[in-house]
Amino acid sequence: MKEREKQMDVLRGIGIILIVLGHAAFPYTHFFYLFHLVIFFILAGYFFKEEYVKDKVCLKKFIMLKIKRLYVPFVIGNIICVLLNNVFINWKLYDNINHNYFTVKDIIVNIIKIILFRGNTEMLGATWFLPILFFISIIYALIEFAIRNYKKKTREYIQIILSIIFLGIGYVLIQKNINLLGIQIFTCYIFFNFGRNFNKYKIKSNNVINCIKFVISFVILVILNKYGDIELAKNEYTNILYYICSIVGYRFSRNNYLTSYKCS
C-alpha cells in the first residue's frame, strides 16, 4: 500500500485555516485570496490517478466517489441551512439586516436550486467552490477516459491545450461581462491539471532549497498583492497573468516549514 503523503494533509489543513481566516475579517484576507482556494483545486488534481479511468467500471466508481465527497455534503449542509434560515434570523446569526424569512415556497425553491447545484445559502456561502471542483473533476476524468489509449505525452499535451483554451474562454467571457453560473469551471480547470502534472514530475529538494522557494514565493506574493487581486468566488482578477501568483501561492504554502516538516 502506498504511504500516505502527510505533507499534503498538512497543506490541506493550511488551506482550510486560510479559508476560515478569510471569512473571519482577518487583516490579511486580501493576501490569502491570491491563492487559498486554488490550493484545493491543485490538491484535487494532485491526487487524481490513472486507475480512475482505466475502464468504465473505474470511471463510474470515481464519479460516485465525487458525488459522495462533494455533492452529498454540499446538498445536505445547505439544505439544513435553508430549513433553519428563519431560526438563524431569530437568533440574529446573520449580520445582514435585510435577510428575509423563508416561506414554504422559498424553502422548496431553494432546496431545488441546491439539489441542482444552482445555488447555496448565505450561511454556507463558502461552499460555492464544491460544485466547481465537482464538475472539473468529472470533466477531467471524462476527457482522460476518452484519450486513455493515447501515449502519455500526447494525453498531457491535450490536457494542457484544453486547460489554456478553457482559461481563454473564461477570460473572454469575463471581459464581456458574461458571468455565467459555474464559469469558474473554465478558469480553474488549469489548476487541477497543474496539480496532476506536479505529482507526476515532483522534484524532491532539501530544507535549504525549500527555504529559498518559500522566500521567493513570499516576496512575489507580497509584490503582486500591492497591485491587484483575485476573487475566485466572483471570478474576478486584475489580470490573467495573476493566475501565476495563485500557483506561486501554492508553492509558498507547500514550501513553508510546516509542510516541509516530516511527521514521524
PLM feature segments, named:
Residues V38, R69-P73, G77, S163, ...:
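Hydrophobic alpha-helical membrane-embedded or membrane-associated segments
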Residues L34-I42, P131-S137, I183-F192, L241-Y250:
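Hydrophobic core segments of transmembrane alpha-helices in multi-pass, intramembrane catalytic enzymes
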Residues F48-K66, Y71, L181-G182, I240-Y243, ...:
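Cytoplasmic juxtamembrane interface segments
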Residues I147-L162, F194-I220:
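Hydrophobic alpha-helical segments of polytopic membrane proteins
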Residues I174, T187, I203-S264:
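Alpha-helical transmembrane segments and terminal signal-anchor/GPI-anchor hydrophobic tails
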Residues F48-K56, N86, L142-K151, L173-I174, ...:
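Structural signal for the C-terminal ends of transmembrane alpha-helices
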